Amino acid sequence: MELESTSNGRRPPPPAEIGRGAYLAWEDLTVVIPNFSGGPTRRLLDGLNGHAEPGRIMAIMGPSGSGKSTLLDSLAGRLARNVIMTGNLLLNGKKARLDYGLVAYVTQEDILMGTLTVRETITYSAHLRLSSDLTKEEVNDIVEGTIIELGLQDCADRVIGNWHSRGVSGGERKRVSVALEILTRPQILFLDEPTSGLDSASAFFVIQALRNIARDGGRTVVSSIHQPSSEVFALFDDLFLLSSGETVYFGESKFAVEFFAEAGFPCPKKRNPSDHFLRCINSDFDTVTATLKGSQRIRETPATSDPLMNLATSEIKARLVENYRRSVYAKSAKSRIRELASIEGHHGMEVRKGSEATWFKQLRTLTKRSFVNMCRDIGYYWSRIVIYIVVSFCVGTIFYDVGHSYTSILARVSCGGFITGFMTFMSIGGFPSFIEEMKVFYKERLSGYYGVSVYIISNYVSSFPFLVAIALITGSITYNMVKFRPGVSHWAFFCLNIFFSVSVIESLMMVVASLVPNFLMGLITGAGIIGIIMMTSGFFRLLPDLPKVFWRYPISFMSYGSWAIQGAYKNDFLGLEFDPMFAGEPKMTGEQVINKIFGVQVTHSKWWDLSAIVLILVCYRILFFIVLKLKERAEPALKAIQAKRTMKSLKKRPSFKKVPSLSSLSSRRHQPLHSLSSQEGLTSPIN
């Protein structure tokens, strides 16, 4: 029967007058994943209608696999390219693209730099995105206002926290993530499960802050949420309840309980409304109940009038979906959508197109932020510098004052090969920090903070002082203790050789981090590549003896190690003389040693070898740029693969199976299924 009014005779209140702000409406919104292999097309969202308005906060709820994230991504314009969306998505009555500056999106994971304080995190983000025409005082005023708006005053000067330093709480981290997104004063704010992993108190404060943002700032706030507490649920103005991509209920959250009661599924007095809603539409409860019955051999309970005990969850869900389609709530939503579709103009809505900061301001800000992060993160460079110092003294004492005897030839070669090969290999230790930095980059890049070129340049500039320190410390200790060829110019070349070799390894690991964003697999991949480079450097097997096909040409020419070792040999041996193997024979020149014994060509200078390393460094940085750009284009294909895996997994879930039609309810109405809780929600029938 069609629902024309609520049980007490009241209808949902008439929609508010249309004023300033962003009015978002969607009509007959459908999202499908086409199966190009010939199988059936998967329908993720099925003909959804709804709207979100300024000054109100909407909750998108539903069981796992119901389409919450898909709906949120559809509204935010973040759908993968492998899916097809149909229907109308209107912004103030117009079909418009939801660009950066108009909308903001807060991800479920809080990706922040743990070494920065809350105030620093927000300040750097403000300088990256706000207009360069603003003075420093004006930017600081915006930052302080945002801190106050999110209630972060008490933790503003505490670090976010990472693996070696304790920081702010989970709720405070989430509010920091929200603060970063509202800096540009977006008109619409989307949030993906902002209370995930938070306790009830922290979740309440987060949603309360979002409600204040919506009401005080006149913004439109839409948030997906899984299973909020009753206190949190009461903070939401509107509710969009989904199940298997279909609308179970859309309207004001305070009328949802009445809707379920009218449909024959009243919420018990002592039960959280959100728990009751999900209990009615989540078919996984049937599986759990059946499993418990089978394992514990529970007897059949007596007949009861409780519909949750007499009906399968899929049947309850089908009835709710059908009742909503025929209800006054659905009619009210469609009527409001028609009103919003008639809006003309933007109604005072300010729209920003991309970041308003200049390229050079972004470069300066990113460089400073990255440098501060490197200084405070002991695992980024400081731990490696300590290890470099220790290893340098070990090398210096083992090869101390190596001399010019015949046996010193092998010692010099071994020492030079170890320094240019194994000591530069230690730069792989910064990979975990690379991974964390890349996460921040991907998140900020997706939100339109800055471009790829700015990030790559700022990363190298900020690391430059640390790389110089590593080269100078290692070069000074080993060069003077081993007593390589004397002379300031030779010492300078030795340090430059180390500097550019370490820079190449750093750049290589950045490429690996962009391709393999997993800590363990990235380390294995990077170590394997560096191992190949070392094998073709000419240290383990002389360059002339390498197989000509592939290993000599082109691998050894692409290996920084071969150029680094050749340059190191020339820098140390040329100009020196060594004692002969047998007494009475003439002394051996350094040129003879490296050319005849070690197969190093002396037709070009050591500076050419150093230039080759610099060229390889530039190539790695360019490759890093290309990989990041290509990943942006290839990401839809990767998401398509992930989507197929997700669909296969969801097909096995009872909650994802297609619900039966309403006409089929009578035939299976009295099956002896049992709910997990009684009507009062305090005890369980399973004893």
Curated annotation (Swiss-Prot):
Polar residues bias locations = 674-687
InterPro entries in alphabetical order = AAA+_ATPase, ABC2_TM, ABC_transporter-like_ATP-bd, ABC_transporter-like_CS, ABCG_dom, P-loop_NTPase, Plant_ABCG
Q: Which residues cross the membrane?
A: 385-405, 415-435, 454-474, 492-512, 515-535, 549-568, 608-628
Q: Name one GO biological process term.
A: response to abscisic acid
Residues covered by region (Disordered):
649-687
This protein's GO cellular component annotations are: endoplasmic reticulum; plasma membrane
Where, per UniProt, does this protein localize?
Cell membrane; Endoplasmic reticulum
Modified residue annotations for Phosphoserine: S661, S667
Record's keyword terms, sorted: ATP-binding, Cell membrane, Endoplasmic reticulum, Lipid transport, Membrane, Nucleotide-binding, Phosphoprotein, Plant defense, Transmembrane, Transmembrane helix, Transport
Membrane topology, from the record: Multi-pass membrane protein
Any single GO molecular-function term of the entry would be: ATP binding
Q: Which Gene3D superfamilies match?
A: P-loop containing nucleotide triphosphate hydrolases
Note the Pfam families from the entry: ABC2_membrane, ABC2_membrane_7, ABC_tran
Residues in ABC transmembrane type-2 domain copies: 361-573
Q: Where in the numbering of this chain does the ABC transporter domain appear? A: 24-269
Identify the tissues in which this protein is expressed.
Answer: Exclusively and constitutively expressed in epidermal cells.
Q: Does the keyword Acyltransferase apply?
A: no
Subunit comment for this entry?
Forms heterodimers with ABCG11 in epidermal cells.
**What family is this protein classified in?**
Belongs to the ABC transporter superfamily. ABCG family. Eye pigment precursor importer (TC 3.A.1.204) subfamily.
What is the name of the protein in this document? ABC transporter G family member 12
Give the originating organism.
Arabidopsis thaliana
Give the lineage. Answer: Eukaryota, Viridiplantae, Streptophyta, Embryophyta, Tracheophyta
Q: From the UniProt record, report the name of the gene that encodes this protein.
A: ABCG12
